């Protein structure tokens, strides 16, 4: 398990000074102090928390950016959710049979944020809507007075006093918001379509990933080699998502947030069959959402006064 770490950074931002290039954002998160401009209209106080679960094959790297704005009548917090979700793709004999092999693989990756605090409201998040592009890059910007806006790419930050960016790769998958309200947001990164040797196939195709070696005893050989699998199936997914929340000043000192990373798994069966002439071939069969919500959830406590982050529980 990765060692928990608390990272504190205070930024002084003037009304006129925009944030420096967000492409360097991840590196800057490791610095002790960063100052921009000479004023102190905004303070950005940063904390980082890492949690890993070997049981679920998940690492959460969460950046908590407290926005202290003298011209905003609420507390604000930007949560950037990064880390790694292992694919947990596995191959095995189906019910100890010799002619049916199975491949369990992630049809969907789940990323979610939730709070039950009545004084906290979700005010912005990234990504929004449905995104089909392989490479996703977006920026959330902040201006004095509590104004959060999103920009389509890493270069769209020039007019912001402070900004936070996301960037991730989702080859053969699409991102979309599945649920969203004032207390929560849930994203699904879902399998879409795949280029195969026999042409383009839908993520729901029963023969997807079925291979060409019906005489092998190894379950792995019943399916296509690693070179034909996209990274999100072969290894896993590196999320990069943002949610921004507001908190009523003078209400509760602390709030709790549940952050969830996980996956929904499909199972593809490769069944050895024979033609009338005795030739063997593999036939595919799919079980969609065979294992759902295989999720790792961590409960974080945020202190609005001291800006401390505590882990209150995990499954």
UniProtKB/Swiss-Prot annotation:
The keyword Signal applies. One of its GO terms (biological process) is cytolysis in another organism. Pfam families: Leukocidin. Residues 1-29 form the signal peptide. Transmembrane segments: none annotated. GO terms for cellular component: extracellular region. GO terms for molecular function: toxin activity. Keywords: Cytolysis, Hemolysis, Signal, Toxin, Virulence. InterPro entries: Bi-component_toxin_staph, Leukocidin/Hemolysin_toxin, Leukocidin/porin_MspA_sf. Toxin that seems to act by forming pores in the membrane of the cell. Has a hemolytic and a leucotoxic activity. Belongs to the aerolysin family. Toxicity requires sequential binding and synergistic association of a class S and a class F component which form heterooligomeric complexes. HlgC (class S) associates with HlgB (class F) thus forming an CB toxin. This is Gamma-hemolysin component C.
